[in-house]
Amino acid sequence: MEPILAPNPNRFVIFPIQYYDIWNMYKKAEASFWTVEEVDISKDINDWNKLTPDEKYFIKHVLAFFAASDGIVNENLAERFCTEVQITEARCFYGFQMAIENIHSEMYSLLIDTYVKDSNEKNYLFNAIETMPCVKKKADWAQKWIHDSAGYGERLIAFAAVEGIFFSGSFASIFWLKKRGLMPGLTFSNELISRDEGLHCDFACLMFKHLLYPPSEETVRSIITDAVSIEQEFLTAALPVKLIGMNCEMMKTYIEFVADRLISELGFKKIYNVTNPFDFMENISLEGKTNFFEKRVGEYQKMGVMSQEDNHFSLDVDF
């Protein structure tokens, strides 16, 4: 039995902290909280109306995938991870992650609602898991892992792949629009969401390091390469990025680059050994590490949450 999954009678009380590295991840997530009301999408409509039909088609399908996927991640957290993991610090993170995923889902739904005026098309996009085969394939893969009988370690890798690989190419495609100076609301929300997902992915890697009996390297490689092939097919065949003027072969390479970064973070050898083909993704590539986080995307970070000085109470102060 993994220690982090073992029955823990102290799980209802936060202090004393036992796992400081996990607790610090929770505080980092807390410091980056945001809401959809803080994203101004009013200027997007002018840009939206100037996009080509292909560009609109691409963005709508990407948003449809995103709108559904956060709910799938949350279902896994609610049904599996939150009940399995018994250490309080990780439960704090997972609870906060669920709130953040709801905000992501609301943001994507609001973007669809703003850009798409036809109610039938809206319904089609909101029900992408049933209506779009390319989205269904990714959703089915993620949902399969919620109900899989595999151990926590394997499912941890699968959902790290969902958040680290299944989202990566779509994030890159929206950053490509930012490079062109288009859709400021969409691209700003993409910065916030990609930062959050990078942190969630880092958290999965941290939890993996706490396992005493992790899955084998062969198992990890199998899950990650499976996710890579599905994501490559999604963005080069089902919903090709050439629709927005991106190079499909470079996108394939980028997804492999992101997968290598993930598997390295898990402590294993790289699979693809490729370099990042997108210079504009240099600081983003779902690294989720402090260098990206501390940029405080859009200068946004909750005041004082990460400030250590505020946490000390002294009776020596002159009142």
From Swiss-Prot:
InterPro entries: Ferritin-like_SF, RNR-like, RNR_small, RNR_small_AS, RNR_small_fam. Fe cation 2 binds at residues 101, 163, 197, 200. It comes from the Viruses. One of its GO terms (biological process) is deoxyribonucleotide biosynthetic process. GO terms for molecular function: metal ion binding; ribonucleoside-diphosphate reductase activity, thioredoxin disulfide as acceptor. Keywords: Deoxyribonucleotide synthesis, Early protein, Iron, Metal-binding, Oxidoreductase. Induction: Expressed early in the viral replicative cycle. It catalyses: a 2'-deoxyribonucleoside 5'-diphosphate + [thioredoxin]-disulfide + H2O = a ribonucleoside 5'-diphosphate + [thioredoxin]-dithiol. Fe cation 1 binds at residues 70, 101, 104. Binds 2 iron ions per subunit. SUPFAM superfamilies: Ferritin-like (SSF47240). Its cofactor is Fe cation. Ribonucleoside-diphosphate reductase holoenzyme provides the precursors necessary for viral DNA synthesis. Allows virus growth in non-dividing cells. Catalyzes the biosynthesis of deoxyribonucleotides from the corresponding ribonucleotides. Interacts with RNR1/OPG080 subunit. Can interact with host RNR1 supunit. This is Ribonucleoside-diphosphate reductase small chain. It comes from Vaccinia virus (strain Copenhagen).
